[in-house]
UniProtKB/Swiss-Prot annotation:
Inactive carboxypeptidase that may play a role in cell wall organization and biogenesis. Residues 1-28 form the signal peptide. Its cofactor is Zn(2+). Gene3D superfamilies: Zn peptidases. InterPro entries: Peptidase_M14. One of its GO terms (biological process) is proteolysis. Residues 182-492 form the Peptidase M14 domain. Residues 29-148 form a propeptide. The gene is ecm14. Disulfide bonds join 317-337. It comes from Schizosaccharomyces pombe (strain 972 / ATCC 24843) (Fission yeast). Keywords: Disulfide bond, Endoplasmic reticulum, Metal-binding, Secreted, Signal, Zinc. The lineage of its organism: Eukaryota, Fungi, Dikarya, Ascomycota, Taphrinomycotina. This is Inactive metallocarboxypeptidase ecm14. CDD domains: M14_CP_A-B_like.
């Protein structure tokens, strides 16, 4: 009980660090010099959470439920099994699936598995292995603690500025930095998207992409540069780049990275010629959280949930793997309870159908063509291009993919000296046997939608934390990703037309 109490206390701290910014998001006006509605009722509500008298304040029922779910991972570990023989990968995957284990990552070199510590002997007796995470609960807890070091303003200073109507763009920028120093829940992310659309309404537009099985709206942010010669008229025939994150709910790091890239493009449009060129050249659509139901579930119930939350016919299990539900190399014969389950038919998931409609209907009606597509994931630090379904298919653009990928990994490395790999997304067992990744987004958009430059981007890390990357790594990762985005856009702009 003492351990559980300490967990709840840290959740209190996390909520306190976020709540001021959430209020700001909800009440920001649509101007660069912000004025914020404020009254005693709001301040009273704020105080009931933060506790200005120094005592721990009340916390939402959702946060309490989430805190009590953390001990569910007690005595669980994450291990890496090294592949030393040609049939190791298929053997390990079959055994893991038969035991209903959570497969975190796999490639031609290793397989990462989440399992009970008591079951580790079975695996290490058969394969050379290492323990990556020896205390899953502790590592999970580290991932949610916000990084509030070097905050330029105190909470009281921020509140005073809001109350006096003196909240300017500089202070907003500083608190946006704080927004990126901890993981945010879905409500905060959606409020942040609305704020961006309000602050930069001459450059951006909020886009409802679709509705999920649980009735939530998938929100995107559309970015365009200013074109004085067009007199504000809608630009037609513009090339589009789509960047999506959060298709797998537990891969949290991709979400703030996508948000950060969108913010930087908006904030630097007037001061950076390279950014201005990219917004003038392309229409950018950022979708930070495609799997909104699943992401919400990782905050309320199970931090390591991956699929969406769509009910399945004739199954007690929930959810579809959104990156296995596309109509290229689709496989509907996977166990519905598996994280790999891609549904009974392509586009069965509301989320993939929504993105399909965006690409094939909404944009085509505006005579716009998608030329770039980035599907942002974690972990493994890799840049991958089609085809994922099979290594027997070589895209005719392989040399171009490789040229661009080399530039992308150089940019990712340049920022913080992090090494990323690059390759075709299929995973070979060896020189003869192949592994198939069915129904992936990058395969469909490349083959069926004729998108020239689709990539699957897997951000930090290499397995030390896996899906539980600490909050202190959000900003460094996001900066790497933004540098990569700039190179990606410049490459397409200069060499693809």
């Amino acid at each position: 009980m003492a351990y559980n109490k300490s967990l709840k206390s840290l959740v209190f701290i996390l909520l306190a660090s976020q709540i001021v910014f959430v209020l700001f998001l909800c009440y920001g006006k649509s101007s660069r010099e912000l004025g914020v509605k404020w009254n005693s009722d709001i301040r009273s509500w704020m105080t009931s959470y933060v506790g200005f008298n120094g005592e721990t304040a009340a916390i939402s029922e959702e946060q309490l439920i989430w805190a009590e779910k953390i001990p569910d991972y007690n005595e669980e570990i994450v291990v890496r099994l090294h592949l030393e023989e040609e049939n190791n990968l298929s053997d390990i995957l079959q055994k893991a699936q038969s035991q209903n284990l959570d497969i975190w990552d796999y490639n031609f070199d290793h397989v990462d598995l989440r399992l009970k510590e008591e079951n580790f002997d079975f695996w290490k007796s058969q394969y050379r292995s290492d323990i990556l995470i020896n205390n899953l609960t502790e590592t999970l807890f580290e991932s949610i603690v916000p990084d509030t070091t070097n905050s330029p303003f105190s909470t009281e200073a921020f509140l005073q500025a809001v109350e006096n109507g003196h909240l300017n763009h500089e202070m907003f920028t500083s608190f946006t930095d704080i927004f990126f120093k901890s993981y945010q829940n879905l409500e905060s992310i959606n409020s942040w998207l609305r704020l961006m659309a309000s602050l930069y309404k001459d450059l951006s537009e909020l886009v409802p992409v679709g509705i999920t099985a649980e009735g939530r709206t998938i929100l995107g942010l559309k970015l365009n540069g200013r074109h004085p010669s067009d007199n504000g008229e809608k630009i037609r025939n513009k090339k589009v780049i789509i960047i999506q994150g959060g298709s797998h709910a537990r891969e949290w790091i991709g979400i703030p990275s996508v948000c950060y890239a969108a913010w930087q493009l908006l904030a630097k449009y007037d001061s950076d010629g390279h950014v201005r060129k990219l917004l003038d050249k392309f229409e950018w659509i950022f979708i930070p959280v495609l799997n909104v139901d699943g992401y919400e579930y990782t905050w309320s119930n199970d931090r390591l949930w991956s699929k969406n939350r769509q009910p399945l016919n004739n199954s007690e299990c929930f959810g579809i793997n959104l990156d296995a539900n596309w109509a290229f190399g689709f496989n509907g014969n996977i166990d519905p309870c598996s994280n790999e389950y891609g549904g009974l038919s392509p586009f069965q998931a509301n989320e993939t159908m929504a993105l399909f409609n965006l690409i094939t209907e909404s944009l085509s009606q505006e005579q716009k063509k998608v030329v770039g597509f980035l599907d942002v994931h974690s972990y493994s630090q890799s840049v991958l291009w089609p085809y994922a379904y099979t290594c027997d298919l070589f895209p005719p653009d392989t040399e171009n993919f490789e040229e661009l990928a080399i530039g992308l990994v150089k940019e990712l490395h340049r920022v913080n000296s992090r090494y990323y790999t690059y390759q075709q997304a299929c995973i070979p067992y060896d020189g003869f046997h192949k592994h198939y990744l069915p129904g992936t987004a990058i395969d469909w958009v490349y083959f069926a939608a004729d998108v020239a430059w689709p990539f699957n981007i897997r951000l930090r890390d290499m397995g030390d934390y896996g899906y539980l990357l600490p909050a202190k790594q959000i900003v460094p990762t996001a900066k790497e990703f933004f540098a990569m985005i700039l190179y990606y856009g410049e490459f397409i702009a200069e060499y693809a037309f």
